[in-house]
Amino acid sequence: ITTCKPASYLLNKAYIQGVPFYVDERVIVPRSYIGELLATGAEFLPAPDAVRSVLDLCTGSGCLAILAAYAYPEAEICAVDLSAAALDVARRNVAEHGMSERIALVEGDLFAPLGARKFDLILTNPPYVDAEAVASFPPEYRAEPVIAHAGGKDGLDIVRRIIAGAKAHLAPRGGVLCEIGTGRDILEADYPDIAFLWPDTEESEGEVFWLTREDFV
């Protein structure tokens, strides 16, 4: 049998940093670089005992919310996604990892359902693929939900919205960790007054940024 589906869909299983997650066609296959930064306790991130609240935007399968719960054992996690179908997958993963008491799953558009809530840490792996790249996806990527990839003409429409709203939802010493793919040059040109920190991972250079609340102008 020949198929262009990702192997993770056929097996209903994907791993980040060795941690297993259930996946199917309702979510993209998780492959975020943020997982490594959480697992290794990157030096710029707050200490585990300093984080009591984490927000995971565009949670998809819930993998980053769950990894955050492991990395920050005292924290309550809020995981938001626009897709009710994706949240059903996340709910299964949260239950399988025994995190139902610590991770709240919320349906909504980015910060919209959160009111005035503030968080010590915001994580997000939002859609960031530009329109041209989405149009030329190979078959295995076309099997994934396009809503989880498509970031507008230059790929950064949703990232810009996150930057615009993040400060209002960060606690005084809070920060945001956001994956953006290859859009670093565009983003730095758009925000010349913001000093982005671009941590590298084993498989990426300059594809994730870190900003503290004080970095926002």
What function would you assign to each model-found segment?
Residues A39, E74-E76, V80-V217:
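S-adenosylmethionine
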Residues T2-P73, L82-V89, A112:
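SAM-dependent Rossmann-like transferase core, predominantly class I methyltransferases
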